[in-house]
């Protein structure tokens, strides 16, 4: 799945959100995916920021608009605007901090409260490079993903392990849902899901795609 550099030309624009506790590595996952950068001194995100990257999927240029916000409670006031229009999410926890995994259910509930319940969600166990410090096993991550019908990967933003794969898988699944619905409807779907367009892509009519647990950690 190749990257695509002409950022102003695309066939589809999908909004993704990064969620999870502060300090789990959301910002570094974003910078690794969009700019291939990692910052050891990365501080907690203040407010909201987003970045974009385009990929070529099945011959179509898919532009991802990925939003990142701090996980700290005092920023919860931005919740509604943050989630609005999102068709995919990466729910991130730190494999070395079990408390960040324990809050995953709360983050998932909040996500589903503000979006379609069948939004494409990838559960991410980040910082897999810190193998000697792991407190959340791969099996625990898989079990939670299976229970909640999520996709699952373990990543390392530091070592760039599975970062591209995780984002690409989410975008691919969204595109497949949109494409299938377009074929069934006999027309071409809207290319944009940006909130200002007043349009969202409703994925609940093809929930069977999401209700199959898929482990992507290999």
From Swiss-Prot:
Gene assigned in the entry: RAB11E
Motif Effector region, residue range(s) on this chain: 42-50
GO function terms (MF aspect): GTP binding; GTPase activity
Assigned protein family: Belongs to the small GTPase superfamily. Rab family.
Lipid tethering residues (S-geranylgeranyl cysteine): 215-216
Gene Ontology terms: cellular component: plasma membrane
Topology within the bilayer: Lipid-anchor
Top-rank lineage group of the source organism: Eukaryota
Pfam families: Ras (PF00071)
Residues annotated to bind GTP: 20-27, 68-72, 126-129
Record SMART domains: RAB, RAN, RAS, RHO
Compartments where located: Cell membrane
Signal sequence interval, chain numbering: none
Main location group: membrane
Keywords: Cell membrane, GTP-binding, Lipoprotein, Membrane, Nucleotide-binding, Prenylation
Record protein name field: Ras-related protein Rab11E
């Amino acid at each position: 799945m190749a990257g695509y550099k002409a950022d102003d030309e695309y066939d589809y624009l999908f909004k993704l959100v990064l969620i999870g506790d502060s300090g789990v590595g959301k910002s570094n996952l974003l910078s690794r995916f969009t700019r291939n950068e990692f910052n050891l001194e990365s501080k907690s995100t203040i407010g909201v920021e987003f970045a974009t990257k385009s990929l070529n999927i099945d011959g179509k240029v898919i532009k991802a608009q990925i939003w990142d916000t701090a996980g700290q409670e005092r920023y919860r006031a931005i919740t509604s605007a943050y989630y609005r229009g999102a068709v995919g999410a990466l729910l991130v926890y730190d494999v070395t901090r079990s408390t960040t995994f324990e809050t995953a259910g709360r983050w998932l509930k909040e996500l589903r409260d503000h979006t379609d319940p069948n939004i494409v969600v990838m559960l991410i166990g980040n910082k897999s490079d810190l193998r000697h410090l792991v407190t959340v096993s791969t099996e625990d991550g898989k079990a939670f993903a299976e229970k909640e019908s999520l996709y699952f990967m373990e990543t390392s933003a530091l070592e760039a392990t599975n970062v591209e794969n995780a984002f690409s898988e989410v975008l691919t699944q969204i595109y497949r849902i949109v494409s299938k619905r377009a074929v069934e409807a006999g027309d071409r779907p809207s290319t944009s899901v940006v909130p200002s367009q007043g349009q969202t892509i409703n994925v609940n009519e093809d929930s069977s795609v999401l209700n199959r647990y898929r482990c992507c950690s290999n």
